[in-house]
Amino acid sequence: MPPWAAALALLLAALALLLLRPWKRAVGARTSVRDHEEQEVASGGPADQFSDRREALPGGCSLICKPSALAQCLLRALRRSAALEPSPRSWLSGPHLQTFCHFILPVGPGPELAREYLQLADDGLVALDWVIGPCARGRRVTNPGSLPPVLLVIPNAWGRLTRNVLGLCLLALERGYYPVIFHRRGHHGCPLVSPRLQPFGDPSDLKEAVTYIRFRHPAAPLFAVSEGSGSALLLSYLGECGSSSYVTGAACISPVLRCREWFEAGLPWPYERGFLLHQKISLSRYASALEDTVDTGKLFRSGSLREFEETLFCHTKSCPISWDTYWDLNDPLRDVDEAAVPVLCICSADDPVCGPPEHTLPAELFHSNPYFFLLLSHHGGHCGFLRPEPLPAWSHEVILESFRALTEFFRMEERMKGLSRRRTSFLGGRRRWGGLQKREVSPSSNLEEIFNWKRSYTR
């Protein structure tokens, strides 16, 4: 797909948005700006249901989480963060401008990438883009004396590589990380070699990719960041793997958490049309390959994101399933209680794609699960959180600072466990050994039987 085609689609949606007044809120919420501001004043924050266990942060942001030692560590790091300090309001403050700048503006030259194609167990292909440059002169070291951590970045579910994703990779590279971008089957130049695409919340391909990354960097900490609708994939992976996950910490930028309701209610018209057109353009090159699997005529006539998703994954010719069954298998929160990795979700109260937090964010998840943390801001749009150039998006700064805090917290925990083990050994008790990693890395011979990979260099 030509890179200008998706940008043109979203640009047309942006123009339509400027002409369309009023538009409906996502997930069925219709509230005026005035009512929303009155609610904020009355509740002291963006959403009334999040008033419990709310910790104030700079810039009018809040951290909602279950009290714990880890929460206190993260809270201290966020309160020291310069990225959250309030800045003068600019023309970028509006939620739609934040969102459109993120999705529409050209990505620019971007980083230098080394692409690997990973052949999966069913012979499908996914792509891993390793960020190899440019290396800044003043590159910081995140963990002195240890291997550089790997940062796995998962773009949105539509497959569009945005300027913010590339900006995060460049900032992470500058801070001493080794970033790698995961691309699904058929996304961003990854060939679709089998007539099977990845469902919205199916983490099977991501599992194999993470195992391969672990094979390549067995001793390096692994962190993961997802953008927008791509968060469903990351959360599904963390839930299915539980304590066996190789990931040390994760973050989700503007995640879609109530996915089924999000599809069924629909987005504001310009966003719905823009994302739908982008998907149709992306899959049009594979129309002939998909003819034996789905009704491509109906697929490309779809008038909504729900109809497109349902036609592509539910109304298949070989094994059709119901819409209810599809979400039983793909709801990203279906196994959320099994997740054993700290997850920071950064959301905005003015998100025009997800909708207001009181309708789209499950407050009980952050109140009851000690691994989930919600950073809620008043402004930022959808995956925007932009600041005046040349400053990076403040969400990127916050994510990397939170990962640093997690690393220090876990290092201290391991140190305390080590002291306890030595004391037990000195007293003659039974010695117990604990490892930094939850699972042993599979022998290379076994992995080589599963995976085949190719590498090509791109700029």
UniProtKB/Swiss-Prot annotation:
| Span of the signal peptide | 1-28
Q: Which Gene3D superfamilies match?
A: alpha/beta hydrolase
| Localisation per UniProt entry | Secreted
Q: Which residues form the active site?
A: 351, 382
- UniProt keyword terms in alphabetical order: Phosphoprotein, Secreted, Signal
Grouped into one coarse class, the protein's main location is secreted
Q: Which GO terms describe its cellular component?
A: extracellular region
User: Using the chain's own numbering, where are the disulfide bonds?
Assistant: none
**Which residues in this protein are found as Phosphoserine?**
425
Tell me which tissues or organs this protein is expressed in. Answer: Mainly expressed in adipocytes and adipose depots, followed by a weak expression in liver and pancreas. In white adipose tissue (WAT), only expressed in mature adipocytes and primary adipocytes differentiated from stromal vascular cells (SVCs), but not in undifferentiated SVCs.
* Record SUPFAM superfamilies: alpha/beta-Hydrolases (SSF53474)
Q: What factors induce this protein?
A: Decreased by elevated free fatty acid levels and aging.
The GO biological-process annotations, alphabetized, read as: adipose tissue development; lipid catabolic process
Q: What happens when the gene is disrupted?
A: Homozygous knockout mice lacking Abhd15 are fertile and newborn pups exhibit no obvious defects.
The family note in this entry says: Belongs to the AB hydrolase superfamily. AB hydrolase 4 family.
User: What's the subunit arrangement here?
Assistant: Interacts with PDE3B; this interaction regulates PDE3B's stability and expression and, thereby, impacts the antilipolytic action of insulin.
Function noted in UniProt? May regulate adipocyte lipolysis and liver lipid accumulation.
* Protein name per its UniProtKB record: Protein ABHD15
Q: Which organism is it from?
A: Mus musculus
